[in-house]
Regions:
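Short, well-ordered secondary-structure micro-motifs within conserved domains or adaptor modules
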Residues: 37-64, 68-72, 185-192
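Conserved catalytic-core segment of nucleotide-activated headgroup transferases in glycan assembly
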Residues: 119-169
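Short acidic, S/G/P-rich loop/turn micro-motifs used as interaction or catalytic elements
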Residues: 8-13, 54-57, 131-135, 167-168, ...
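A short, gly/pro- and small-residue-rich
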Residues: 54-83, 146-147, 201-215
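Leloir-type glycosyltransferase catalytic cores
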Residues: 82-122, 216-270
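Donor nucleotide-activated moiety binding/catalytic core segment of transferases
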Residues: 37-42, 153-207, 211-214
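N-terminal pre-catalytic "stem/leader" segment of glycosyltransferase-like enzymes
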Residues: 1-48, 52, 132-133, 259-270
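Short loop/turn segments at strand-loop or loop-helix junctions that form parts
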Residues: 3-9, 72-76, 121-133, 163-166, ...
Length: 270
């Protein structure tokens, strides 16, 4: 069984706001679709299924109760103008589990993603999250941005470019991350965004400044801004292997409904 956390804001009278992506995951898990804004009346053995970082209060309640929760959000890579892939993690918001050294590459190849070799550049690209994402961590976006940029400038004279998170149409059609990273970028600095994975894909070192153990790119990222001028850049083989692992942690809606996603998440063997 599984619980959806829904926040039915002004649903039609007598109806409950549903989420078809979450529904398909629960169907594939042979679960029962239930709706609740709270977990108080739900048996502890029933896991919660949560989509989107705005559900921070329910996530915190699950942690306090010791309840398993499955988190669904945008996939790490392989999405074009439509969101084909959705990442799903258990008791975390990004995959930070074991990175298998000889992970099969079949799912990575299916995404059609091509890696770019490391290319030197001059400017530092800072990619802050949205305030909504920062709310989860109890942080103010502008305050974090000022502290981070000030810290960067203590260690380098390189120009700093801030790329605020725009709407999806802009990010997908007019100013993609690939375009941004092609503009003479030396490295990326972000808080906890999956943009860190994209930075590695397009051949740029990345600094992840969020809490340890919360970013999927962390095994290959930098964390100390004192190294901003000479950051660690993993090999293409290391990046490819990380992506092969992450490809097994993101799923299509069809894979959710068929039960494949549930099986992978609970029987993580190759």
């Amino acid at each position: 069984m599984a619980l959806i956390d829904a926040d039915p804001e002004n649903p039609p009278e007598g109806q409950v706001k549903m989420d078809p992506i979450v529904d398909n995951f629960i169907i594939g898990a042979d679960g029962v679709i239930g709706m609740s804004k709270d977990t108080g009346n739900i048996p502890l053995e029933v896991p919660a299924v949560i989509r989107g970082i705005a559900k921070r209060k329910v996530i915190q309640r699950c942690k306090e109760e010791g309840r398993d929760w499955y988190y669904i959000d945008t996939g790490y890579f392989g999405n074009g103008k439509t969101k084909l892939y959705h990442r799903i993690t258990r008791n975390n918001m990004q995959y930070t589990g074991k990175i298998h050294e000889n992970c099969p590459d079949d799912r990575f190849v299916q995404t059609g993603v091509t890696l770019t070799k490391y290319r030197p550049g001059d400017c530092i690209l800072v990619c802050p999250p949205s305030q909504k994402a920062m709310n989860y961590w109890g942080l103010d976006l502008q305050e974090w941005l000022k502290i981070t940029v000030d810290d960067i400038k203590k260690h380098t004279d390189r120009p700093v470019v801030i790329r605020e998170k725009a709407g999806r149409d802009v990010r997908v059609n007019h100013d993609t991350m690939e375009m941004a990273l092609n503009r003479n970028v030396h490295c990326m600095v972000t808080f906890n965004s999956i943009a860190a994975v994209e930075s590695l894909i397009y051949g740029k070192p990345v600094f992840t400044m969020g809490p340890t153990g919360t970013n999927a790119a962390e095994p290959l990222s930098n964390t100390d801004l004192a190294n901003i001028d000479n950051p660690f850049m993993p090999s293409m083989d290391e990046v490819r292997n990380l992506l092969c692992n992450l490809a097994y942690q993101q799923f299509t809606v069809h894979e959710m409904r068929s039960g494949y996603a549930w099986e992978r998440l609970n029987n993580n063997v190759f």
